[in-house]
């Protein structure tokens, strides 16, 4: 399957990407704009998030809120590639099964998230963690590291 999009320059260091359906994502080096490197992290968070929510929904996990926090370490020297990324899946709800959430994250990391799979083929490790908050309290754990 081939994917295609177009990136257009709009002066200075302002660009936008347009996909075949017409969706537009702006990019900028200016304050308040997303740089391409941050969009890469956003793509990873969005990709694994969509996978995890899909699997948790199928497993009937009773969650009210879900978010993904992504942080990364970069090399000092150019091209300043990412060397390690931490993806924290934060889930809040009632009676949440740690096993079901962990399995959803593992399936995303190992099977479904092509953004993570692509990054992990290079010189970058991706550590997926989870933080669950429900009536039992808050708990965290590392789920899986790839790359």
Predicted features along the sequence, with ranges:
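Extended beta-strand/beta-hairpin segments
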Residues: 1-42, 53-147
